[in-house]
Swiss-Prot record:
Active site per UniProt: C188 (thioimide intermediate), D195 (proton donor)
GO cellular component, one term: cytoplasm
SUPFAM superfamilies associated with the record: Tetrahydrobiopterin biosynthesis enzymes-like (SSF55620)
GO MF: preQ1 synthase activity
One Pfam family, short name: QueF
Pathway the protein contributes to: tRNA modification; tRNA-queuosine biosynthesis
Position of the signal peptide: none
Originating gene: queF
EC number of the protein: 1.7.1.13
Claim: NADP is one of the keywords in the record: yes
Residues binding substrate: V87, E88, S89, H227, E228
InterPro entries hit by this protein: GTP-CH-I_C/QueF, NADPH_dep_7-cyano-7-deazaG_red, QueF, QueF_N, QueF_type2
Subunit structure comment from the entry: Homodimer.
Protein name in the entry: NADPH-dependent 7-cyano-7-deazaguanine reductase
């Protein structure tokens, strides 16, 4: 359990509660969660050790045009990691549902509305793009970059989070490499529902022991935090124990409620080059 599980800021969230679905535009449905909750737990100050963003894909985005004809689109949203708040995912889903029976004059108006409301919730300007469904029908399914570390003949008998797996995990060999794992699984901070993800780790520095890294990632299996918080924990733990010269951590989670969340944290990159789907997305 994290130190902030019972924080007052979490008690008013609709997540985990029975809610009424609204079908006409209602921006008040959006709920913010202060990023400071887990960053205080990680002893992060105002000067963050990373940059990056949270990339959301919106698969259930629909509204009515001026003639009442339903429109559908796929949206992509990027929330800067520097924003004071993250957007709680169930409230995001409920907010998007409120578009369903609302008339908009154009696709641009929908985009402008999303930018305005999400930026107000996050506390910083949010980037939004919306695309026709046809664009996504042509998008390939890809794998993460680098080598997969999952196929190791090791025994796992501990599934409690333990950053100490990364202690003494580097050698004297300097390397620049990209590794990935599909075994990332954590649980929702509020509901305990499982969150399934894949994570890509790109670094330059002392070579990291792959067995220890995999044991560390598997230790999230019973851990309760939001997606964004897990990725920031992975980033800060690798920096603490492995001290690479540069580091990028990118996780892509399976969708829930028509949304997938893909947190990206880096020592030097503001955003991933592409937003491409994995097999489980």
């Amino acid at each position: 359990m994290t130190k902030y599980t019972n924080a007052d800021e979490l008690k008013s969230l609709t997540l985990g509660q029975k809610t009424e679905y609204k079908h006409t535009y209602e921006p008040e449905l959006l709920q913010a969660v202060p990023r400071s909750l887990n960053r205080d737990d990680l002893a992060l100050g105002d000067e963050l050790p990373f940059v990056g963003c949270d990339v959301w894909t919106l698969y259930e985005l629909s509204w009515l045009n001026q003639n009442g004809l339903p429109q559908v689109a796929v949206g992509e949203v990027a929330l800067p990691a520097t924003s004071p708040n993250l957007v709680e995912s169930k409230s995001f889903k409920l907010y998007l549902n409120s578009f369903n029976q609302t008339k908009f004059t154009s696709w641009d108006e929908v985009k402008e509305t999303l930018v305005k409301d999400l930026s107000a919730c996050a506390g910083e300007t949010v980037k939004v793009d919306i695309f026709p469904v046809q664009r996504y029908s042509q998008q390939p399914i890809v794998d993460m970059q680098g080598e997969c570390i999952d196929d190791q003949d090791i025994i796992i008998d501990d599934y409690e989070f333990n950053a100490a797996y990364l202690e003494s995990s580097t050698s004297d060999v300097n390397i620049e490499e990209t590794l990935h794992s599909h075994l990332l699984k954590s649980n929702c901070l509020i509901t305990n529902q499982p969150d399934w993800g894949s994570v890509e780790i790109q670094y330059k520095g002392k070579k990291i022991d792959r067995e220890k890294l995999l044991r560390y990632l598997i230790s999230f299996r019973q851990h309760n935090e939001f997606h964004e918080q897990c990725v920031e924990r992975i980033y800060t733990d690798i920096m603490k124990y492995c001290a690479p010269e540069s580091l990028t951590v990118f996780a892509r989670y399976t969708r829930r409620g028509g949304l997938d969340i893909n947190p990206f944290r880096s020592s030097h990159l503001l955003a991933p080059k592409d937003n491409l789907r994995l097999a489980r997305q």
